[in-house]
Every structure is written in structure tokens, then in C-alpha cells.
A protein has these predicted regions:
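Beta-strand secondary-structure signal
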Residues: 23, 33, 44-46, 60-62, ...
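Hydrophobic ligand-binding cavity/cleft-lining segments
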Residues: 1-18, 134-135
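Short beta-strand segments that buttress and anchor functional surface loops
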Residues: 20-27, 46-52
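Beta-strand/loop substructures that line and gate deep hydrophobic ligand-binding cavities in soluble
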Residues: 51-108, 113-115, 119, 124-126
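Residue-level recognition of beta-strand termini and adjacent short loop/turns
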Residues: 16-18, 41, 67
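Charge-rich (especially acidic), low-complexity segments
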Residues: 123-135
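Short coil-to-beta-strand transition motifs
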Residues: 27-31, 55-57
Length: 135
């Protein structure tokens, strides 16, 4: 909630040692659930995200120490659409629509985290512009 420019609400479903599961509601009302499948202390985590009964995408967050006061964060997304049907048929829609929207979204999320860290206050909603999937 504090750094995500498109997140309206984030609720914990279950947060025990071996079971991390939460729900995100975006500004446009879209609700997704995240099931964390691996948690690597001081390195990052992997999760599956999607609507409650819908298709799931796989996401990996990784943190790398650069120096004492600097880290690098990477987010790798494997959208569910890439694993559906013919790769040849999916190639053009993915390249023309999904990939640019995904890059824009991730740039805003990372920008929100940077903004929050530098300003020590919540990132304003849609701070980096609206997003057609989540605003």
C-alpha cells in the first residue's frame, strides 16, 4: 500500500511461516491473490498471482546488494498468456500489447518503491501516470 502507485488495498489472507497468501485490490477494482511459493531470506521471493479462480502468472522479486547503501531490485514476470496455446499465435499480441503494458506497470511499481524510500511517505496513487490495466 505504501509504495505501490496502483494498489488501493492489500489484505493478508494467511501469513504463517510456510504459508504466505494475500489479496491486492487495484485502483480500478480488479482483485488478485498472491500465493508466495518461496521465500529466500535477504534475497527475494517467488509468487503466483492472478484472480482467485483464474489463471496465474509467476513472478520473482530479487534484491542484490551493490554497496553498503545501495541495492538493486529486479522483478521477473512470466505472464500466464505466454503458456497458453501456440507461441506463434501468442507472439504478436504479447509483443504489441502485453509486454509494453507490463513494462510500464513494473516501471511504475519500481518508481513507487524508489519514491517511497526517498520521501519517507506513501507514493501518491497513479503518481507516474494511469495504467490501463490497474488505474
Amino acid at each position: 500500500d505504501l509504495y505501490h502507485p496502483f494498489c488501493k488495498k492489500n489484505d493478508i489472507i494467511d501469513w504463517k511461516k510456510d504459508n504466505h497468501h494475500d489479496r491486492l485490490e487495484y485502483l480500478n477494482g480488479v482483485v488478485v491473490e498472491r500465493k508466495f511459493i518461496s521465500w529466500i531470506e535477504d534475497k527475494g521471493y517467488d509468487l503466483n498471482i492472478g484472480t482467485k479462480d483464474g489463471r496465474k502468472s509467476h513472478v520473482s522479486w530479487r534484491i542484490e546488494d551493490i554497496s553498503e547503501n545501495k541495492s538493486a531490485l529486479s522483478i521477473e514476470v512470466h505472464p500466464w498468456i505466454v503458456n497458453q496455446g501456440s507461441r506463434i499465435v501468442q507472439f504478436l499480441p504479447f509483443q504489441l500489447f502485453v509486454k509494453p503494458q507490463l513494462k510500464s506497470y513494473l516501471k511504475s511499481v519500481l518508481g513507487g518503491l524508489k519514491w517511497y524510500a526517498e520521501n519517507n511517505k506513501p507514493t501518491p496513487r497513479n503518481h507516474f501516470g494511469v495504467h490501463r490495466w490497474f488505474s
